[in-house]
Amino acid sequence: MHKYRTHNCNELQISDVETEVKLSGWVHRRRDHGNLVFIDLRDHYGITQIVFTDQNPQLMEDASRLRYESVITVRGTVVARSEDTINNTLPTGHVEVLAVEFSVESAADTLPFVINTEKDAPEESRLKHRFLDLRREKLHNNIILRSQIISHIRHLMTASGFTEFQTPILTASSPEGARDFLVPSRMHPGKFYALPQAPQQFKQLLMVSGFDRYFQIAPCFRDEDARADRSPGEFYQLDVEMSFVTQEDVFSTIEPVMYDLFTKFTDKKVSETPFVCIPYNESMLKYGSDKPDLRNPIIIADVTEIFRDSDFTIFRENIKKGSIVRAIPAPKAAALPRSFFDKMIEFAISEGAGGLGYIQFSETGEAKGPVVKFLSPQQLESLKATASISNGDAVFFASDKKEKAAKLAGKVRIRLGEELDLLEKDCFKFCWITDFPFYELNEETGKIDFSHNPFSMPQGGIDALEQAKTTEELLELTAYQYDIVCNGIELSSGAIRNHKPEIMYKAFSIAGYSEEEVDKRFGGMIRAFKFGAPPHGGIAPGIDRIVMLLAEATNIREIIAFPLNQQAEDLLMNAPSYVEDKALKELSIMLSPSARKNAEKE
């Protein structure tokens, strides 16, 4: 018989009755019934009930003193449970093991929080004792699910003709839109490596190297603040790149992967392929967001022209100054109490708006509300037609400069979806957002900057760049760039790449970069493009967000084994931490006075 176990704790069935077995695991629960002691023994696979009887008083007494989460090995005989004690919620619920002997492999101290329930514990304690937290069923299952998803992704990609690569972790700093994690070089004092924000340049270089289809479950590092769906330091993505492809080729390659994943690991309804494509400008108009939740049926409408000649002075004057008006329908909300409308106004104010106008259309078609008196009957009918308003509905209005009005309308749409319980249940709604602006205005400098990935191919190529003379014309340029969105969560960005040096130099010059600066920052890739680069494109769906959706987790830390907290700290390993002066000296690093003072405190 094996030293520790003959079976796992999820394995024993009624067919194993009278079999002598040995099990090892953690003490999950203990119940003392006087002449009987029951222990639920848990391992990675499941739970088996162990019973100690007064036929062996010493063994039963020893079992009654076992602390929760102690690791034990038990030898005994499988017996059938009586009819009234069968537990159909457990795979092993028809049997139990009558213990003959047990040994304690490792005794547990007093627990900082309860393991055998899903009752919330303080997150700081959970992260500090993550090894305990990971024993809890929900989190344990999430990590198993993550492994299964990644394994299946590898299978799908390999079956589709992709080759898996590993790219460098120590690389050069590049502008990916977030701060780098820098690593000082001992051999080159004063110089730094950067942890890759993404393997962007390397995967493109692999295409130039003659490989056709690349993928990697890639670790990415960005020094950015935490969010519910974003880890503050490290995350993983399914990094993909393909040669000789169009945007549509990328879509038709990734859609089956997403569909297969979401149908395999959930019973919910999944959007059929091909996924709907929504141009960026249309998405901002209809949904007030570039990551729309299509479970929400509300469609925003532009009603600027209706208010342009209305008697509503505030909107009319705003329109003269370049503002717009967006209408956000609220289905079947006309009869709701005044408190609902006040609540929506308070929400808009909390989002930085001056307020939120609205109209209620009764079941008989009568219009009421603070805006009604400023509109003619014809304008009210035009409003209903333009915004698809029916009798019994209400409609809210957002007025501001185009970008601000769109974003406010989008937030109101989301809030209405929640308040009115409009979201379609038990489904995953996918869509592509396409035709992103190539450039944007930098809010701090007021100058032209790349809106997303600087390596994207502008639609129209170099001709489009050369023909755009004014700022307005430059801001109208679009890129072969796309996002895949599911239930309002951006799962990935991707693009057809700019593989021609002359187009890259021109695109960067418009954003204020000289050829020398481009060569300095992206020399390796530019040099490669001068030796025959294939047209190529790619995408990089976020592994963490995919797992988060499939696990129905509300926080990304619930699907990562050892996450950082919101302050980018690892409470288990005490990172980041100060290092000895000797190590700093070897790296030619000197702490600032304030950093030195903090180090001395510790």
From Swiss-Prot:
<feature type="binding site">
    <location>
        <position position="222"/>
    </location>
    <ligand>
        <name>L-aspartate</name>
    </ligand>
</feature>
<keyword id="KW-0963">Cytoplasm</keyword>
<dbReference type="GO" id="GO:0003676">
    <property type="term" value="F:nucleic acid binding"/>
</dbReference>
<feature type="binding site">
    <location>
        <position position="490"/>
    </location>
    <ligand>
        <name>ATP</name>
    </ligand>
</feature>
<dbReference type="Pfam" id="PF01336">
    <property type="entry name" value="tRNA_anti-codon"/>
</dbReference>
<feature type="binding site">
    <location>
        <position position="497"/>
    </location>
    <ligand>
        <name>L-aspartate</name>
    </ligand>
</feature>
<keyword id="KW-0067">ATP-binding</keyword>
<keyword id="KW-0547">Nucleotide-binding</keyword>
<dbReference type="GO" id="GO:0005524">
    <property type="term" value="F:ATP binding"/>
</dbReference>
<dbReference type="GO" id="GO:0050560">
    <property type="term" value="F:aspartate-tRNA(Asn) ligase activity"/>
</dbReference>
<dbReference type="Pfam" id="PF00152">
    <property type="entry name" value="tRNA-synt_2"/>
</dbReference>
<dbReference type="InterPro" id="IPR004364">
    <property type="entry name" value="Aa-tRNA-synt_II"/>
</dbReference>
<dbReference type="InterPro" id="IPR004115">
    <property type="entry name" value="GAD-like_sf"/>
</dbReference>
<comment type="similarity">
    <text>Belongs to the class-II aminoacyl-tRNA synthetase family. Type 1 subfamily.</text>
</comment>
<dbReference type="InterPro" id="IPR004524">
    <property type="entry name" value="Asp-tRNA-ligase_1"/>
</dbReference>
<feature type="binding site">
    <location>
        <position position="452"/>
    </location>
    <ligand>
        <name>L-aspartate</name>
    </ligand>
</feature>
<feature type="binding site">
    <location>
        <position position="176"/>
    </location>
    <ligand>
        <name>L-aspartate</name>
    </ligand>
</feature>
<dbReference type="InterPro" id="IPR047090">
    <property type="entry name" value="AspRS_core"/>
</dbReference>
<keyword id="KW-0436">Ligase</keyword>
<dbReference type="GO" id="GO:0006422">
    <property type="term" value="P:aspartyl-tRNA aminoacylation"/>
</dbReference>
<keyword id="KW-0648">Protein biosynthesis</keyword>
<feature type="binding site">
    <location>
        <begin position="222"/>
        <end position="224"/>
    </location>
    <ligand>
        <name>ATP</name>
    </ligand>
</feature>
<protein>
    <recommendedName>
        <fullName>Aspartate--tRNA(Asp/Asn) ligase</fullName>
        <ecNumber>6.1.1.23</ecNumber>
    </recommendedName>
</protein>
<dbReference type="InterPro" id="IPR004365">
    <property type="entry name" value="NA-bd_OB_tRNA"/>
</dbReference>
<dbReference type="InterPro" id="IPR006195">
    <property type="entry name" value="aa-tRNA-synth_II"/>
</dbReference>
<dbReference type="InterPro" id="IPR047089">
    <property type="entry name" value="Asp-tRNA-ligase_1_N"/>
</dbReference>
<dbReference type="GO" id="GO:0004815">
    <property type="term" value="F:aspartate-tRNA ligase activity"/>
</dbReference>
<comment type="subunit">
    <text>Homodimer.</text>
</comment>
<dbReference type="InterPro" id="IPR029351">
    <property type="entry name" value="GAD_dom"/>
</dbReference>
<feature type="site" description="Important for tRNA non-discrimination">
    <location>
        <position position="33"/>
    </location>
</feature>
<dbReference type="GO" id="GO:0005737">
    <property type="term" value="C:cytoplasm"/>
</dbReference>
<feature type="binding site">
    <location>
        <begin position="542"/>
        <end position="545"/>
    </location>
    <ligand>
        <name>ATP</name>
    </ligand>
</feature>
<dbReference type="InterPro" id="IPR012340">
    <property type="entry name" value="NA-bd_OB-fold"/>
</dbReference>
<comment type="function">
    <text>Aspartyl-tRNA synthetase with relaxed tRNA specificity since it is able to aspartylate not only its cognate tRNA(Asp) but also tRNA(Asn). Reaction proceeds in two steps: L-aspartate is first activated by ATP to form Asp-AMP and then transferred to the acceptor end of tRNA(Asp/Asn).</text>
</comment>
<dbReference type="Pfam" id="PF02938">
    <property type="entry name" value="GAD"/>
</dbReference>
<dbReference type="InterPro" id="IPR045864">
    <property type="entry name" value="aa-tRNA-synth_II/BPL/LPL"/>
</dbReference>
<keyword id="KW-0030">Aminoacyl-tRNA synthetase</keyword>
<dbReference type="InterPro" id="IPR002312">
    <property type="entry name" value="Asp/Asn-tRNA-synth_IIb"/>
</dbReference>
<feature type="region of interest" description="Aspartate">
    <location>
        <begin position="200"/>
        <end position="203"/>
    </location>
</feature>
